[in-house]
Regions:
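Alpha-solenoid helical-repeat scaffolds
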Residues: 1-210
Length: 210
C-alpha cells in the first residue's frame, strides 16, 4: 500500500515484475506477448509507472525510513540483472522518491552522475522527482540541472547539445513545479513560449505523447 514499507539500509526495494500474461475465453488459454506483434518499446512506460508505484510504497515517516544518498544509489540495477526493464523501473523509482520528498537526500555528485551516465528514462524520472521534491522553492541547484536538459534555459552562447524531446518536456514540467506559485515573470514567459511552439513540419515532436 501507499507509504507502508520501511526501507532497510542493507536491502534494495523490491519492484514486482509486471504480469503481461492474459487469459483468452472461453477456455482460459494463456496468451503471451511473445505470440503477438507488438511495438518494441511497448513495455517502456508501463515499466516506468511500475517503478513509480513501487517507490510510492516507501514510508515518509522519519522513524521508519533509512533513505539517504547511499541507499538510493544502492538501488541502481546491477549489470547482471536479467530484467530488461530494470533501468526504466529504476527511473520510475527515482520519480517516486521525489514525489515523497526523499530525493532531496540524493547527493549533488550522484544526481549529476545520473544525468550524465543514465538513460533518457533516468533523466526524466530524476528531473521530475527533484522538481517535485523542491516544488515552489525556485531552488538554484535544481534549476541548473533542469537547464542542462532544456535549451530555453541555456545562454545563447552555450554549445548546442543533443537533447531528446522527452527530456526537454520533462525539464519544462520541472520548471513549472519548481516555480509553482512564485509568480516569477521570466519563468512564466519561458514556459508559455515553450508550450506555444508548433510541433514542427515533420511532426517529429508528436511521438510518444504520454
Amino acid at each position: 500500500g501507499l507509504r507502508t514499507v520501511s526501507s532497510l539500509p542493507t536491502e534494495t526495494l523490491d519492484i514486482p515484475r509486471l504480469c503481461l500474461t492474459g487469459r483468452a475465453p472461453p477456455r482460459g488459454a494463456k496468451v503471451e506477448l511473445s505470440h503477438i506483434d507488438v511495438s518494441h518499446n511497448m513495455e517502456h512506460w508501463p515499466s516506468f509507472h511500475n517503478g513509480v508505484s513501487a517507490g510510492l510504497r516507501l514510508s515518509t515517516r522519519p522513524e521508519s525510513t533509512d533513505i539517504d544518498s547511499t541507499w538510493i544509489t544502492f538501488n541502481k540495477p546491477k549489470s547482471n540483472d536479467n530484467n530488461p526493464n530494470a533501468v526504466t523501473e529504476h527511473a520510475g523509482f527515482l520519480m517516486a522518491l521525489g514525489l515523497n520528498g526523499h530525493l532531496t537526500k540524493l547527493g549533488r555528485l550522484e544526481s549529476f552522475d545520473y544525468l550524465i551516465k543514465g538513460s533518457e528514462a533516468i533523466s526524466i524520472g530524476l528531473l521530475l522527482g527533484m522538481s517535485a521534491s523542491k516544488r515552489g522553492s525556485m531552488d538554484t541547484l535544481v534549476t541548473k540541472k533542469l537547464a542542462t536538459q532544456l535549451e530555453a534555459l541555456l545562454p545563447h552562447t552555450a554549445t548546442e547539445l543533443p537533447l531528446s524531446h522527452n527530456t526537454q518536456v520533462a525539464a519544462l514540467m520541472g520548471v513549472g513545479l519548481l516555480d509553482s506559485g512564485t509568480g516569477h515573470q521570466r519563468m512564466v514567459e519561458l514556459c508559455l513560449k515553450e508550450l506555444g511552439k508548433p510541433p514542427g513540419p515533420e511532426l517529429e515532436n508528436c511521438v510518444d505523447r504520454e
